[in-house]
Amino acid sequence: MRRRDFNRMALGFGLGSSVITPVAAQDPAAKTKPAGGAAAPTVISNTGRTYNQLHLPRKYAQGQRRFSVYWAWNYPWEANRDVTELDNRFSTMTEVRRVEWPFYEKPEYAERMFLQGIAGTLELFHLSLVKFQNSVGEVTGQPVSVYQRIDQAGQRLPLDERILADTDTLMVFGLDHMVTEQEASADEIAALQQFLTREGTCLIIGPHHDVGASADMDERQMEYKHHGDELVPRQQRFGLYTRSLMKGLGVPVENRYGLRPATVKETGDITPLNAMRDLDSRGWLNGVTTFNFHPHLPHYAVTTDDPKAIRILGKQAIELSIPHPFTRAGNKEFNAFLWMPPDGARAGDILLVDLTIFTTLFGGTDSLDSFWKNLATKA
């Protein structure tokens, strides 16, 4: 795999050298409200990181959306996976260092400073979200809350009022390996249905890829060669929790494959998003021309024939020079961004977009910043 490609992948998941440097933390206590009633942006400062404490509810303020991120994984089960297993687990930090040697041979990644097992990789994902948290916090004047279904200490937190009561936009990240058997309960489905009856709410569902679903070993190898990421095994199936969530909520979508986006030959940048702007009546993609590069992105397959059930707002061109079963079937693009506007008793929006759009330190482009800002202001 070319270094350029790995660095893009690494940045896409936040595996850049900057993840260990001090990061800006949100300080909601430092907010002030100026004369005239306009909301002041969140003051960002290098405050201390906290852990092992209960969430302090955020107060509702008109025009200041309260974002919550929900990692749908079982952290201990993911971190404790048998590293002799070839498939359906995250890489260890040691494996990341070996593949990209000597990029990570720095004091901040040494065993004295950073976890070397699978847990180290999971923590990189957490750190990779900070830029999005700070960017949205500046726009909304509200801190972004981050939850885990089962955290490092084995504390279980299903989706319920403890999360939803002070949330306007809920982001569910489907980075749980299917073998860990995370599924939404009937109570969680009911809680989300009730949440979406509240006007102005938004549910963003972000299941990641489903690589190697076929039992055919040759097909798995073709998928592996297509995305080219040495850290992704021949089978890595994510998102059972989000699949069960979508089924329970009547969202006719399934995450499939891990597809490599096409790039511009001269620059190596990802090709522009094929945006269906005539269907984007809310303006989610205003000022957005591209998402960020990631070598294995899911195709969000629509599983209904009803054209009114869901709108495909963005498609991404696939790298066609490296074969894949999906492209051999005649496909040249994959569904990257979908929207279900409010309908009937559901007053809230439902959006589908891959979680790597948010877990990135590469997201300093105007296009991606515009997308984040739109999510914070258009719902």
List each language-model region with its residue ranges.
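N-terminal export signals
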Residues: 5-24
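Short, surface-exposed patches at the edges or C-terminal ends of soluble domains, predominantly
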Residues: 26-379
